[in-house]
A protein has these predicted regions:
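Class I SAM-dependent methyltransferase SAM-binding "motif I" and its flanking Rossmann-like core
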Residues: 1-21
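A contiguous loop/helix-start segment that scaffolds small-molecule binding in enzyme catalytic cores
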Residues: 23-95
Length: 95
């Protein structure tokens, strides 16, 4: 569980460190930053890393978009994100 990522100071080093993690990561994000964060994750982790972006969990408008970081980022660039997000990102596979 990572919670919210650092906004400015320390964000790039934190993403670089997380890119090497073998565990599944859970990250919180606001609708205003979710597409940007997904793009940054794709750059740091590789665009083919799988993820799920879930919003409004246990509420009326619950939605979960699954795919690669690239696909999910493109989805939220084309469709305005609403609600609070939980990003679930797969860990690094064995090389």
């Amino acid at each position: 569980f990572e919670g919210f990522l650092p906004q400015k100071t320390g964000r790039a080093p934190r993403l670089a460190a997380l890119a090497e993690e073998p565990r599944t990561m859970i990250i919180y994000e606001s609708p205003y930053r979710v597409a940007k964060t997904l793009r940054q994750l794709a750059e740091a982790f590789g665009s083919d890393r799988r993820c799920a972006a879930c919003r409004e969990i246990s509420k009326l408008h619950e939605e979960c978009v699954r795919g690669t970081l690239e696909e999910v980022a493109a989805h939220f660039e084309a469709n305005e994100p609403r609600g609070e997000f939980v990003l679930i990102v797969e860990g690094r596979g064995k090389a």
